């Protein structure tokens, strides 16, 4: 199968706006290359200079990449949306298009994606690696393919940590915008009784189902394609996880308030720090108490409890 890589070179102020556009257009994955954000990690222990080009940190502009099936026609709508971005943010946006084959993508993941631990119990690993878990560890096998959600990005780590901390066993959880299915699988592995995983992207649903099957959790996790707001109306939940964008998280909060039991939790992530005040206000407006806020450079994740 062949894919189109569409990349937008622009300024950091409009990262979330363009990532949101790609998401609405049905992208099978978004990659953000931000030298300014990377420079903040340069002196940290986990920084690996081998994962970036030698001159990457010297760049001033960001590159936002998205992936679409070759036959998908999105350029006309994308260009229209980018005109609005340029006008609203007073920036320039330069577009590049390239071809990517499945085997190119897969070989790249196998080169850079390795086992790592999140929280107290969760160990994430690709299926091609062998690992003997230590006492108390819960292992998740993930082949991310071109779907968002490997556990590497801060926004995914935040939600994983919330799930690790708050899931005690027997809960019903909704995973809104499930991507690779990693959050759903984590919840089920930690004892959730039932999980509804939703995404608007066909590719994400396909990959999530494959990962659910890979982990032997098809009897607990249901993966569906469609509108999460419409689907969850009849689903009473103990927890709702939304690792998407601040815009979508804000829209989901009122719906989460309707389906969550009293004392239930909402986990929101993918929130850039400039959008946090709006998300916080929306949570409080709809009867949530902020329990925990995590931040990594510009990214924020929140765990909130319904009163």
From Swiss-Prot:
Q: Which residues form a coiled coil?
A: none
This protein's GO cellular component annotations are:
cytoplasm
Protein origin, superkingdom? Bacteria
Q: What is its main location?
A: cytoplasm
Q: Which reaction equation describes what this protein catalyses?
A: L-lysyl-[protein] + 3 S-adenosyl-L-methionine = N(6),N(6),N(6)-trimethyl-L-lysyl-[protein] + 3 S-adenosyl-L-homocysteine + 3 H(+)
Where it sits in the cell: the answer is: Cytoplasm
Does the keyword Transit peptide feature in the UniProt annotation? no
Question: Its GO biological process terms?
Answer: methylation
Q: Which GO terms describe its molecular function?
A: protein-lysine N-methyltransferase activity
Please provide the record's keywords in A-Z order: Cytoplasm, Methyltransferase, S-adenosyl-L-methionine, Transferase
**Is this entry keyworded Membrane?**
no
Query: Which InterPro entries does this entry report, sorted A to Z?
Result: Ribosomal_L11_MeTrfase_PrmA, Ribosomal_PrmA_MeTrfase, SAM-dependent_MTases_sf
Which residues bind S-adenosyl-L-methionine per the record? Answer: 156, 177, 199, 243
Q: Which family does it belong to?
A: Belongs to the methyltransferase superfamily. PrmA family.
What does the record give as the function of this protein?
Methylates ribosomal protein L11.
Q: What is this protein called?
A: Ribosomal protein L11 methyltransferase
What is the species of this protein? Answer: Syntrophomonas wolfei subsp. wolfei (strain DSM 2245B / Goettingen)
Q: Corresponding gene?
A: prmA
């Amino acid at each position: 199968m062949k894919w189109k890589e569409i990349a937008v070179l622009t300024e950091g102020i409009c990262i979330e706006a363009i990532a949101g556009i790609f998401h609405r257009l049905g992208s099978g994955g978004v990659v953000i290359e931000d030298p300014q954000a990377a420079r903040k990690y340069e002196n940290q222990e986990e920084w690996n200079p081998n994962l970036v080009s030698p001159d990457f940190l010297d760049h001033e502009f960001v590159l936002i990449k998205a992936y679409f099936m070759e036959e998908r026609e999105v350029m006309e709508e994308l260009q229209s949306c980018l005109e609005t971005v340029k006008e609203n943010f007073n920036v320039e946006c330069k577009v590049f298009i390239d071809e990517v084959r499945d085997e190119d993508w897969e070989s790249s993941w196998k080169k850079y994606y390795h086992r790592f631990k999140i929280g107290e119990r969760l160990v994430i690993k690709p299926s091609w690696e062998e690992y003997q878990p230590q006492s108390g560890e819960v292992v998740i096998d993930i082949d991310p393919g071109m779907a968002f959600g490997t556990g590497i990005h801060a926004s995914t780590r935040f939600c994983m940590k919330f799930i690790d901390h708050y899931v005690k066993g027997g809960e019903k959880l909704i995973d809104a915008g499930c991507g690779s299915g990693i959050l759903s699988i984590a919840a089920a592995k930690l004892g959730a009784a039932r999980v509804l995983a939703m995404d608007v992207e066909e590719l994400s649903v396909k990959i999530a189902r494959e990962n659910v099957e890979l982990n032997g959790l098809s009897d607990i996790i249901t993966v569906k394609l469609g509108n999460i707001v419409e689907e969850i109306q009849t689903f009473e939940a103990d927890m709702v996880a939304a690792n998407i964008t601040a815009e979508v998280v804000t829209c989901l909060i009122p719906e989460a308030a309707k389906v969550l039991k009293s004392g239930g939790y909402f986990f929101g992530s993918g929130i850039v720090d400039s959008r946090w005040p709006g998300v916080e206000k929306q949570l409080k407006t709809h009867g949530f108490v902020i329990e925990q806020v995590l931040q990594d450079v510009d990214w924020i994740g929140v765990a909130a409890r319904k009163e």
